[in-house]
Amino acid sequence: MTPRTALGALHIGALMFGLTGVFGKLAAASPAVIVFGRAAFAVLALAFFARFASQHGWQKLQAVDWRRLALSGVLLAGHWVSFFLSVKIAGVAIATLGFASFPAFTVILEGLIFRERIRANEIVLVVLVSIGLILVTPAFDLGSGATIGLLWSVLSGLLFSLLSLTNRASSGRIPAVQAALCQNVVVALCLLPVAAPQLSEVRALDWLWIALLGVFCTGVAHSLFVASLAVIKARTAAVVFAMEPVYGITVAWLLFNETPTPKMLLGGALIIVAIVVSARMSGHADKKTVAAEAASH
């Protein structure tokens, strides 16, 4: 794969990740069913990639690895359920922008968990995200469905941040595809008791959207990221990954006529700038960490 091809694959992967909220809105099913189906189809796609395309062998897992993968799988399940709840309540644009607040949570949690000193530019990042969220908030009223949806998406961002830090603590030993596959198995098992009674009611068309969500927005997108990281720098991949909200909001605008207000556009711009700046600042991020983060959305 040439650098130009790899960069194109990264953008296609980011576009697929950006379509997550779109397919979630198209599927007329509960968030529990959507997340269960997404995880189940993702397991199939990732298993295919691991079998035929991955250059990394299957790592034998120890007890500590299983515990970390189980924890990260539970966090991933919570992240996805809260995100799709936000999509159903408030729409794709608000859900995507609320989730995009995760770099601010990461900065704060890194200081608390890893005892890392928060730098001045990271404080600016937190301020940018905070102002962006204030501007994106439809109304400061908990009786507003859109505001409740935004809160669900912010919770999704918090859980994603915790998941990223969990992956960071355990990255390096387990190949990214293997870790993603195991995490999706945990997600499917977590949601199975809730989703099982509803599965017979899901229409064929909705299964199509869920399958696309699991195969393309999870399995194929993650596989493209992993393949392109062979020739692309981790920081470049992180910056491209930061464009995911732009793709998602643009498609939602075109498909669902979710026209953002000028205030929402300004808030979204601040949040996206914060994500790009965060990605460029992450000099310590290695390729396995970036791949793990990509798999988690």
Regions found by a protein language model. Give the residues of each.
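Glycine-/small-residue-enriched transmembrane alpha-helix faces in small-molecule transporters
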Residues: 1-40, 44, 71-74, 82, ...
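Juxtamembrane helix-entry segments on the extracytoplasmic side of multipass membrane proteins
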Residues: 2-6, 28-36, 61-66, 138-159, ...
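Hydrophobic alpha-helical transmembrane segments of multi-pass membrane transport proteins
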Residues: 12-19, 23-26, 49, 70-85, ...
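Hydrophobic/aromatic residues within transmembrane alpha-helices
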Residues: 27, 34, 38, 70, ...
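Transmembrane alpha-helices of multi-pass small-molecule transport proteins
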Residues: 29-78, 105-106, 159-166, 180-198, ...
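C-terminal-most transmembrane helix of multi-pass membrane proteins
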Residues: 39, 50, 138-139, 206, ...
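Hydrophobic transmembrane alpha-helices of multi-pass small-molecule transport proteins
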Residues: 46, 50, 70, 118-138, ...
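C-terminal transmembrane-helix exit sites in multi-pass transporters
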Residues: 50, 102-127, 134, 246-266
